[in-house]
Curated annotation (Swiss-Prot):
Pfam families: F-box, FBD. Transmembrane segments: none annotated. Residues 4-50 form the F-box domain. Residues 297-346 form the FBD domain. This is Putative FBD-associated F-box protein At5g44940.
């Protein structure tokens, strides 16, 4: 049977969009396929690079990266990139050139910017034009330093923001608050604190914490419009402390996807948090992680979202026990009226020790939603 090359029938505009999803080093390799493909990668509206992918001879790979980008930007001088993703490993001090390059990309109207810095020293990343970008739709930063801007941030198109291992100097959360407050259409927000971030909240009612209290309150108000959020244990603890000491947290009217990580002692925060935000009238997806066996589960509150909107629940890293894991599962099955699927995944260690009777009890739990499926992963 004669083979047919369907890909060659695709127009160039479709091929470049396909190549956009590949690392640039793989996109470049397609240039050997045929004469048509020789320069096609140059028309891809984005780059996905790692500095150590460049050869170390005759230049250090960082210099090779800079030379490559200079030539590429010269070739694309009259067009703008949709996406730029860089994983930067620094050894010879070319970060200033990288920052200049990113500033140029922003000036040219970049839409998606992802920067992952692997350096020994913190890098002051954001330039003024990034704070004022009219085209950025998604921004993801790792291991950089953000300094407090002395002007109003304006990112009118930014919908996705991820900040991981970010350093803020002396101004702390105020920097993030300013950044988020300038994003009127923000939908997805992910904040992951550095491992050595020792910020504590203490008693928020104490006078010495008044500044933190105000910052947290303003910050919660700013992020209350997000649709998708991921929170760690320390964040859930802060929310719980705020609601207990200072009153209800702002309502998250648009929130439809919540992912949270709990310790063995903090699970009790879950219904309180959900109830504190009636706040979740649109919540449909809930993902929970438990690196330890949950204890002292005694849920009496049933948030409105469980009754009216919650459709998918996923519980990860669970260890089933008669009075903990099963009770947690029962809580959702017995109170979620429109639940469509409950997915349970267990730690490898837990799977080896699991009592088969535990699975049977899960499958026979009383379900308020008759169509709910229980998936054991």
């Amino acid at each position: 049977m004669e083979e047919f090359d369907y890909i060659s029938e695709f127009p160039d505009c479709l091929l470049t969009q396909i190549l956009l999803n590949l690392p640039t080093k793989d996109s470049v390799k397609t240039s050997v396929l045929s004469k048509r493909w020789r320069n096609l990668w140059l028309n891809v509206p984005g780059l996905r690079l790692r500095t150590f992918d460049f050869p170390v001879f005759p230049y250090p790979y960082e210099e090779g990266f800079v030379r490559f980008m200079d030539r590429f930007m010269e070739f694309k001088c009259r067009s703008r990139l949709q996406k730029f993703m860089i994983t930067y490993f620094e050894h010879n001090g070319y970060r200033d050139r990288l920052m200049e390059l990113i500033g140029t990309l922003v000036d040219r109207g970049i839409q998606h910017l992802y920067v992952y810095m692997h350096t020994c020293n913190r890098v002051d990343f954001i330039r003024q034009n990034i704070y004022k970008s009219k085209t950025l739709v998604s921004l993801k930063l790792y291991n950089v330093e953000l300094k407090n801007p002395e002007f109003v941030v304006s990112l009118p198109c930014l919908k996705i923001l991820k900040l991981e291992n970010i350093f803020h100097g002396e101004d702390g959360p105020l920097v993030v608050e300013k950044l988020i407050s300038g994003c009127p259409v923000l939908e997805d927000l992910e904040l992951i604190r550095p491992f050595d971030d020792n910020v504590g909240y203490g008693s928020l009612t104490a006078p010495k914490y008044s500044r933190n209290r105000d910052i947290i309150g303003d910050f919660l108000t700013v992020i209350s419009s997000v649709r998708h959020t991921i929170i760690c244990y320390s964040t859930s603890k802060m929310l719980y402390s705020y609601s207990k000491q200072l009153g209800p947290i702002p309502q998250f009217h648009n929130l439809y996807h919540l992912q949270a990580r709990f310790s063995s002692s903090s699970l009790q925060l879950l219904p309180t948090f959900l109830e504190s935000c009636p706040a979740c009238p649109n919540l449909k997806n809930l993902i929970m992680e438990f690196p330890f066996e949950p204890k002292n589960i005694d849920f009496h509150k049933v948030p409105q979202c469980l009754i009216s909107t919650l459709e998918y629940v996923q519980i990860e890293e669970l260890i089933l026990k008669e009075k903990s894991g099963i009770k947690l599962v029962d809580y959702f099955l017995e109170n979620s009226a429109v639940l469509k699927k409950l997915t349970l995944s267990f730690t490898y260690h837990s799977k080896k020790k699991q009592d088969p009777e535990s699975y049977k009890k899960l499958l026979t739990s009383t379900k308020l939603s008759p169509t709910c499926q229980i998936i054991i992963d």
